[in-house]
């Protein structure tokens, strides 16, 4: 079984609203990227399950990803967004989990920390404790989209909410030039492996790389992540459905799988099967 833990799907008006959800996020889609387009992509490439992730440009209304997961319950689960600055976000999180069937949420510390360094630490805000406890009470999963410099927030949250499963999105964006410093800027991310409730998505390697396949300048840090977290806590994810992959400068799904199978040749067959 192959599971893609990270694909964005969306609709546009009049089917679903569009609009930014966070500071420094202003992109607006001009065309849809549907669940059906993703299903065709999955079927053509042997992918069994996908986690649908609400985009940052689809407002706080998670209806499309929630409905898609309920429409195709044997192929999808949904991760939603909830506003970390909304005083009613605990009730909102409960609604999306209890009434609409989403299994988790995505937060973007990188979009907030650029303004007020303290106020921007959304995973550490006392005002969000009830929301995170609400998600924890429901065995929710939370994925964190951020840079390595914000790893301290996840370190705090993973300790404070040990019953939440936390996922690191896109490896927290390691940069190949860090290799000259023995990858030391990435040490705070690797240190998160001390938390048994933190997992890491091995994804977006190609966009960080300055080299063509097999993206050799990124393979050492992938190895370090695998060694730190262990094969039981690494996940595989991609980004967009169908032709939207190349439109957003991502490789096709077949190439994503080739990276996982051929470029990551340091993984055993069993380890690779576990990641996928």
Where are these regions (language model features)?
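Short amphipathic alpha-helices and their capping/turn segments at secondary-structure boundaries
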Residues: 1-2, 90-100, 152-159, 184-194, ...
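An N-terminally biased module of ancient metal coordination in phosphate/nucleic-acid-related enzymes
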Residues: 1-60
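Hydrophobic faces of well-ordered beta-strands that scaffold small-molecule active sites
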Residues: 3-7, 50-53, 77-80, 103-107, ...
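Catalytic metal-binding/acid-base residues of hydrolase active sites
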Residues: 8, 56, 147, 172, ...
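Short, acidic/polar
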Residues: 31-42, 86-97, 184-185
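Active-site gating/metal-coordination segments in enzymes
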Residues: 59-149, 156, 199-205, 212
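Short, electropositive alpha-helical surface patch
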Residues: 60-75, 158-167, 220-227, 251-263
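H/E-rich (His + Asp/Glu) clusters that bind or coordinate divalent metals
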Residues: 175-276
